[in-house]
Amino acid sequence: TYKKPKKFEASVSASLLGAGLYVGYAKKNFSMTHGVRYKTNQYMLGSLETKGEYSPRFLDYQTYISWSPNKRWSLDFIGNISQNQYDFLPTNRQTNFGTMQDVKSFRVYFDGKEEDLFRTLFGTLSLSHSFTDRTKLSLLASAFATKERETYDIQGQYWLDETNTTEQLGVGTYMEHARNYLDANMKSLKV
């Protein structure tokens, strides 16, 4: 059961990590709610071992609309749209490991970037008829669509060193590459 407001109501929230907005409205046999949220974790990700420019962003919108022309019939719609975007431009990483007497250093310098996008749309329309207080029949039409894209080309050059001496234990390079795409659509109709 979703919240149905009795009158106009609204709220706003904001922080360094994002913002949100909610609006609800009702008049006689009609009600609707809408919500929007935006969030970014960009400022929290600066403490990770891999240094670079992190830019994750999340945006979503939800709605619930209800209309009841009389006590027996109701028409309801619920919907959601979301877009999550993750961009990453790595620059370097350094990790120290080992024992107190035998500390090693692993350093990596990067070229390239990662760009990911996840977009989702969902909606359901419901037409319901109550025959009695205990008998209700509903026709539900729903649709879901998603589009996902993960793409990156990141090359890293690495060095493994003894930290107590100038001895170099190893050097190397590697390449990570991906082009992952997913498009999915689903529709359903049920009683």
Report the location of each language-model feature:
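Transmembrane beta-barrel wall of Gram-negative outer-membrane proteins
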Residues: 15-38, 51-89, 115-139, 143
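Hydrophobic alpha-helical membrane segments
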Residues: 44-49
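Flexible loop and strand-edge segments within Gram-negative outer membrane beta-barrel domains
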Residues: 52, 74-75, 79-126, 130, ...
